[in-house]
Amino acid sequence: MKDRYILAFETSCDETSVAVLKNDDELLSNVIASQIESHKRFGGVVPEVASRHHVEVITACIEEALAEAGITEEDVTAVAVTYGPGLVGALLVGLSAAKAFAWAHGLPLIPVNHMAGHLMAAQSVEPLEFPLLALLVSGGHTELVYVSEAGDYKIVGETRDDAVGEAYDKVGRVMGLTYPAGREIDELAHQGQDIYDFPRAMIKEDNLEFSFSGLKSAFINLHHNAEQKGESLSTEDLCASFQAAVLDILMAKTKKALEKYPVKTLVVAGGVAANKGLRERLAAEITDVKVIIPPLRLCGDNAGMIAYASVSEWNKENFAGWDLNAKPSLAFDTME
């Protein structure tokens, strides 16, 4: 059987990425051009800046991905692309490049949900067994997803307000940490003590919903009040207390979901899945099901994960037309 090569594109936010996947599971290349340095001074992603950067580097990323994979344009079998959720301008750059490549070479175009990409990045660790449950944690999303089979995703719980990664970045900004703040808060948390009593919203409620706005507000109020009084607070202890509250919420809801949906596998994915504290809690507390977390290089936004997610769509021949458009608010269906 002839080898299949999928060329995948990811430009939903501030990473321009192009990857090549051979057959179902051999990631030959995963080129990522990060824009973090451009957005640091703004304390967050500026959509217009992100779009312009994507335009500047997308062609070079395609060339590098093909070269690193050791294939030519003529070897590509199909093109996969993120079409949502994300920043509309950023998404359109990847969509335009993917459609142009597919059209020029007469190839099928595979539409991929960005969050499905995060989830299916776990396929790089080992073949996934369905049904499974996934905890998706990133800068824009916090959700529990039930996956009955590859490509069939249903939300069973999600945040009512801030995403967990968003909360990390906002409290990081208050402390004067560098954007994105997640890694630094995690590192500082391991040097401090959980001495500040922050709220754990909805932790005892009988649902699978998350809420981080109250925790974020409590943190900001404590920090500002201390500043106004001229008091000095330990940054390490603040980070340790904040992260302890976040992880308590995530763990409580995940355990509740595992009780409700008896599965053998839990996938934890998204940018926040790189968090050392979260990985430690999962290893210590989730012992009755298999926990699969993508490698660090596949936790953040990257086209490799989009390639993995595209395989199930390829198998179903779920191809898009040339009218495929960006869907910035694209979401999985909710479990009824």
From Swiss-Prot:
Specify whether Acyltransferase is a keyword of the entry.
yes
Q: What is a GO molecular function of this protein?
A: N(6)-L-threonylcarbamoyladenine synthase activity
Q: Which reaction does it catalyse?
A: L-threonylcarbamoyladenylate + adenosine(37) in tRNA = N(6)-L-threonylcarbamoyladenosine(37) in tRNA + AMP + H(+)
What residues does Fe cation bind to?
A: H114, H118, D301
Which cofactor is essential here?
Fe(2+)
Specify the enzyme's EC class, one word. Answer: transferase
UniProt entry tagged with the keyword Secreted: no
Task: Name a GO CC annotation attached to this entry.
Answer: cytoplasm
One GO biological-process annotation of the entry reads: tRNA threonylcarbamoyladenosine modification
Functionally, this protein is described as follows: Required for the formation of a threonylcarbamoyl group on adenosine at position 37 (t(6)A37) in tRNAs that read codons beginning with adenine. Is involved in the transfer of the threonylcarbamoyl moiety of threonylcarbamoyl-AMP (TC-AMP) to the N6 group of A37, together with TsaE and TsaB. TsaD likely plays a direct catalytic role in this reaction.
The UniProt entry's sequence similarity note says: Belongs to the KAE1 / TsaD family.
Q: What is this protein called?
A: tRNA N6-adenosine threonylcarbamoyltransferase
**Lineage of the organism:** Bacteria, Bacillati, Bacillota, Bacilli, Lactobacillales
